[in-house]
């Protein structure tokens, strides 16, 4: 098991309930694959440094989790097929 950190930005057109539902969805992906979510930090709505997909702000979330080496690939796939995700990044913590 390794420690990972992911930051993802969700579309700002979501309401607060939709934002939290998406965060729970991603937590569920991690937990269903046998991983554990260590920390979730909801940064809220912030302005982007530059426009992405014609959007200038988004909901930022930082999530730390522990999982096997295959889970980041699955989480990346889920991020890519979720329309509300503007950007995401998954890194290994040392």
Swiss-Prot record:
One of its GO terms (biological process) is translation. Keywords: Ribonucleoprotein, Ribosomal protein, RNA-binding, rRNA-binding. SUPFAM superfamilies: Ribosomal protein S6. GO terms for molecular function: small ribosomal subunit rRNA binding; structural constituent of ribosome. The keyword rRNA-binding applies. InterPro entries: Ribosomal_bS6 (IPR000529), Ribosomal_bS6_sf (IPR035980), Ribosomal_S6_plastid/chlpt (IPR020814), Transl_elong_EF1B/ribsomal_bS6 (IPR014717). The keyword Glycosyltransferase does not apply. One of its GO terms (cellular component) is cytoplasm. Pfam families: Ribosomal_S6. PANTHER family: MITOCHONDRIAL 28S RIBOSOMAL PROTEIN S6, SMALL RIBOSOMAL SUBUNIT PROTEIN BS6M. Belongs to the bacterial ribosomal protein bS6 family. Binds together with bS18 to 16S ribosomal RNA. This is Small ribosomal subunit protein bS6. It comes from Clostridium botulinum (strain Hall / ATCC 3502 / NCTC 13319 / Type A).
């Amino acid at each position: 098991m390794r420690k990972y950190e992911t930051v993802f930005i969700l579309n700002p057109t979501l309401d607060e309930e939709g934002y939290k539902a998406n965060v729970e969805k991603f937590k569920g992906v991690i937990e269903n694959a046998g991983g554990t979510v260590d920390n979730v930090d909801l940064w809220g709505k912030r302005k982007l440094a530059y426009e992405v997909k014609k959007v200038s702000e988004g909901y930022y979330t930082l999530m730390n989790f522990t999982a096997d080496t295959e889970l980041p690939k699955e989480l990346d796939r889920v991020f890519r097929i979720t329309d509300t995700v503007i950007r995401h990044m998954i890194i290994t913590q040392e």
